[in-house]
Structure formats: structure tokens, C-alpha cells
């Protein structure tokens, strides 16, 4: 995705996974040929077609997108706190008496043992209703049927294929569908000296102030490797305990020029 400035006044064209002075560390205001900004507008106006589709027997919900959608079969209102919270509610107001299916896409990162589905307050065996990544619910829908999905959104460590040489020995963090990165403004200079532990105990925080307000941040114990002043030395770098902070990748470069990295060495 293209990282967008919080004021929408500029954006970053490069989909880089680390940011240093020589690789466009800030957001330019404009380009001679600017294709991404109008494409973003086109995306917003097309969201409805990405979120839903309909067949003769089934309504398909492809995204946990808060909205009200009007179809031949029903009007469906979706209340969603995703991706920051694991709760999505569908309110179905049927236009027809015949039964039809509502198929809800369940992202692959959601663990089935944490997924709870209720229909009008009654718990449903979600595992038996899922096929090819969709939760299928079929019944004679009324004028105010409510489907509620709840699930956990743990912080996950992601590893690259070993054929990706640049990412060997590194991990990235994700929570739900959101990729995270580490910026120098939170973690100090020399980002490459930071290390992620093999076993992490991450905590999340909803940011309430500044340009990142509304975003969920990740805090976790980590390490900083400190070496001697020599360019090369036989002295092994010393490890210092630190608290690391990660922000959503799309939000980087909103707080001035500083280093950024997605893939972090694992210690």
C-alpha cells in the first residue's frame, strides 16, 4: 500500500521496507507524473464493489467494512471496529421470504479457536460453516437479524522465505492485516542495531494524541546492540534491554525525517 500523510497533502511512492536518508525518507508534496493520488480516489469510490458481490442464492461479504449495503435480497448494515478490534456485527433486513445464504469472508490470520459467531444471540458452530475461507449462514432472514463475529487479534511474527536473502534472519510484525514498522522517532537512532527476541511479549496501545491518533501501536521488550567506536573490532557488541515501539507501516514518515525499518533482526 502507499503510505499517505495524515493531512493527505503528500504520499510516499516507494514501497520500501526500510528508510534512510538516501532512500526518500520523507514524503514529497507532488510528482511530475502523479498516478497514485487519483488511483486512491478511484479506490475509495470502488470500495463497494470490492466489499460485496451477489449471486442468485448468496450474498458475499468480502471485507469487514463498516457500511450499509442495499441488495435485492436484503439491506445489510455492518458495524466494524476491524482491524483495531476483533468485532464485526451484521444487521440483516430481508426483502424476501425465501431463505438465502450470507457468506462472510474470514481472513486467514483469524484462528478458528478464537472465532465466536452468534446469530440473534445464539452461538453457531463456526468451524462447520466455513468453506474456502467463507462463513456460510443460510436461513429465512427476518427484518432485524443480527450476526456478531468476535475474534482475537494477537501480534504475530512473520518470517520471509529463505530465498529472500535481504530478510534472512529477520522478522516482521503484523496484527490482523496490518503490517508494522519501527521508526527512529520512537526507538532512537541506528535502527539496524535493534533486535527482536525469539519469544515476544507484545502489548498494544490505542494512540489518542498526535498524528497517529486512532492507530494501534505495539510495544515489546527488545534489545539494542552497542559496539565499540572502531569500524571493525574483535569485541562482540553488548546487548542492552530496551522497549521497542512499532507503528502501522502505512503511517510512517508522518513525524519528520527519521529511520524506518520493517524487517528486524531476530536475536
Model-derived features: positions:
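Single conserved hydrophobic/aromatic residue that forms the stacking wall/gate
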Residues: 1-13
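Beta-strand-rich binding/interaction modules
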Residues: 97-119
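A broad structural signal for short, well-ordered beta-strand segments within beta-sheet-rich domains
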Residues: 112-114, 126, 202
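Conserved nucleotide-binding/hydrolysis modules and their immediate coupling elements
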Residues: 133-135
